[in-house]
Amino acid sequence: MLIPSKLSRPVRLDHTVVRERLLAKLSGANNFRLALVTSPAGYGKTTLVSQWAAGKNELGWFSLDEGDNQQERFASYLIAALQQATGGHCSTSEVMVQKRQYVSLTSLFAQLFIELAEWHRPLYLVIDDYHLITNPVIHDAMRFFLRHQPENLTLVVLSRNLPQLGIANLRVRDQLLEIGSQQLAFNHQEAKQFFDRRLSSPIEAAESSRMCDDVAGWATALQLIALSARQNNNSAHQSARRLAGINASHLSDYLVDEVLDNVDVSTRHFLLKSAILRSMNDALIVRVTGEENGQMRLEEIERQGLFLQRMDDTGEWFSYHPLFGSFLRQRCQWELATELPDIHRAAAESWMAQGFPSEAIHHALAAGDAHMLRDILLNHAWGLFNHSELALLEESLKALPWESLLENPRLVLLQAWLMQSQHRYSEVNTLLARAEQEIQGMMDGTLHAEFNALRAQVAINDGNPDEAERLAKLALDELPIAWFYSRIVATSVHGEVLHCKGDLSRSLSLMQQTEQMSRHHDVWHYALWSLLQQSEILFAQGFLQAAWETQEKAFQLIKEQHLEQLPMHEFLMRIRAQLLWAWARLDEAEASARSGIDVLSAFQPQQQLQCLALLVQCSLARGDLDNARTQLNRLENLLGNGQYHSDWISNADKVRVIYWQMTGDKKSAANWLRHTPKPEFANNHFLQGQWRNIARAQILLGEFESAEIVLEELNENARSLRLMSDLNRNLLLLNQLYWQAGRKNDAQRVLLDALQLANRTGFISHFVIEGEAMAQQLRQLIQLNTLPELEQHRAQRILREINQHHRHKFAHFDEGFVERLLNHPDVPELIRTSPLTQREWQVLGLIYSGYSNEQIAGELAVAATTIKTHIRNLYQKLGVAHRQDAVQHAQRLLKMMGYGV
């Protein structure tokens, strides 16, 4: 819960002086990105800005305290303030902060600005007491905020010092409105108005001016003069002389003498006790001070001018002026030292009663009461964990003695989950093992099962599937149905293990169970994870359309639950890109991979490896080797500067080996093959992929026997485990092996199998990537006219893709190529004596690429009759009678020129 008073603009009091000259300056704030009001304590920053804010409906106010250095807390209040200002316009951002579903403050602000782009009226956000922020991450995020905020949004910052917000840059660009302590200091006219409203007897203007000069226009000093004069019947000028030259750091003695020593004992104790509260209401005051009517007492203190200010229009919430509150808290530590722990306990109990466990923890820590802290955590820790109050939880658990954790082992479990969330896997197991060893008496079976569920998650994250499976099964055997979170974890881990072991049907079933349980209990990150796993399994089984539909469910879940900034969103964009690539929708695949990289913009560059590999893959499918090389340079740099899971390395190696194949780089392939470890098994699609990389490198190096042994074993495993997509890929690679080894019949046999299987998988680009060798075989199959209708259609589609993306390498007879050909010593005499025109060379290239007459006419934008004339002429010049003869003639010319066709 958010404390309402922190989001309420201070109430304007009747007796305050209206600072017309400063309000006039602030009236132009909407023309600036930042309005900055800075001065030491007590110069009236908050009062001035609250006067300016009066009547502005589209304004959010956020009053900071020390606890707002926690990023999650800062974000929650900032978004809530803007929600108040816009009447709930930023609903997506609000859900994201409530569920902590954002990667960083900057990514959250980026989402916020997307929503605010549709808000066209002037908008203001006031952040008070910014000097309390010491977290550099928040400073960085607010600099990002200022750089990218919409033009119609003005940020108003109140601070005792110059904040680290890139002020100089804003000043140079004339995007900064500044008001400092010299401008905030009262002038003679304002001082006269102030005393006239505060003192029962008016004073002369000259005396008022002298007092203003004595204290250099410091508003707090003027207030103290008026307070002292009322309390002691002293002359105001006498108080002014004493305050002359004083500053905030030396104010304590004065406040003791002139304020605390001049109130009755009851009021003094009230001030000291209530000062421990950062904000207060009736219930808190009654519990902390023992007063019977807290609201009445607060209003009385306010009337006495004792630096108490209302924080909302209802008058329910109050706080002390920061300068006076700090002074009172210091005096409380000195004067009420023995009572202070009890006062903090009372505050904690009252905050708990009002439903604010975070504030209660703050006071329990201050009280040093481990028992109270333990009780609060036992009742509220998991709620705080689910809302990502991780820093507060970590501080709280560290404050508890180890013996207390052992007596309440669920707190040990919480501490272990905290470590797991921070990827401190080895520490998790150490902590749980120590706890199990030292817990007195028999350990509860359910708790032991919860320990095992967490251990299972750690084991699978750490790449130990056998141990993960053992622990997940133990957990599921012992966990009651009501312990839903741990059951979700254990079921998910078991399903993931089966996925790794190639037991796809059982894995799919468990992941569907995980999804159902997670949706039922609103555990959205596990619901999303289960959908991603289901999609990968369906893809591996060859059911790409079903995988697509599962991905659609995942996209919908992300949208509904605002999960866009979770790293799993990148996973979804990546597997969508893989699917689009398989279907030769290359532009969409590339866009999806780039979107995945955008999701990871706040993470280390190494996290982008998989999406970067997909960008290389798109370039390779297009035959764009220059672009592929540029992207490969980035990919290989990342590979050399990080530690990666084996399947990440396999995907990166795949595009490297294909690139070497397409460029004939046998040296790189041989070097890679020497240093690449060979997996022990091939029982899932990750391991199949790496073995396929090895076989492709072996084929490139002419090691056909070794490659055939690998591929035959891969096919055997793929058939037994129903890894149909892998089988489709393996058949295509086996086809290339047979083709290059001169085993044309075997090559045709496995190509026919691959085409038939592609009716299920929908594969296109996996064929295209094999280039001209694949094109030649498909041309022959099409010309034989023996393919079934579906396979015939797919073969034609694949051939069109190869022609589109790879023709420039193999069959595009451009002017440069023709010139080199005619100068070649072995060029046929017929071509030398009766050369083709440039257009006829183009037509020959398109015939060789498998184009029909109509397609050639469309490609060259001429009439079909014109194409027939060109074909008749080139047949005559080449001395051929049929289309197949022309294809063979073009092939001989390409071979003569050194093309490996």
From Swiss-Prot:
Q: Name which cysteines form disulfide bonds.
A: none
Is Transcription included in the keywords of this UniProt record?
yes
One Pfam family this chain carries? TPR_MalT
Regarding activators and inhibitors, the annotation says: Activated by ATP and maltotriose, which are both required for DNA binding.
A GO biological process of this protein is:
positive regulation of DNA-templated transcription
| Occurrences of domain HTH luxR-type (ranges) | 829-894
Is Transcription regulation one of the keywords UniProt gives this record? yes
What InterPro entries does this protein's entry cite?
A: P-loop_NTPase, Sig_transdc_resp-reg_C-effctor, TPR-like_helical_dom_sf, TPR_MalT, Tscrpt_reg_HTH_MalT, Tscrpt_reg_LuxR_C, WH-like_DNA-bd_sf
Cite the binding residues for ATP.
39-46
Query: Which UniProt keyword terms apply here?
Result: Activator, ATP-binding, Carbohydrate metabolism, DNA-binding, Nucleotide-binding, Transcription, Transcription regulation
Tell me the leader sequence span. Answer: none
Question: Residues annotated as DNA-binding region?
Answer: 853-872
Q: Which GO terms describe its molecular function?
A: ATP binding; DNA binding; DNA-binding transcription factor activity
Query: Which superkingdom does the taxonomy of this entry point to?
Result: Bacteria
Task performed by this protein: Positively regulates the transcription of the maltose regulon whose gene products are responsible for uptake and catabolism of malto-oligosaccharides. Specifically binds to the promoter region of its target genes, recognizing a short DNA motif called the MalT box.
The UniProt subunit note reads as follows: Monomer in solution. Oligomerizes to an active state in the presence of the positive effectors ATP and maltotriose.
Family named by the database record: Belongs to the MalT family.
The record's listing under NCBIfam families reads: PRK04841.1
Q: What is this protein called?
A: HTH-type transcriptional regulator MalT
Query: What species does this protein belong to?
Result: Citrobacter koseri (strain ATCC BAA-895 / CDC 4225-83 / SGSC4696)
From which lineage does this chain's organism come?
Bacteria, Pseudomonadati, Pseudomonadota, Gammaproteobacteria, Enterobacterales
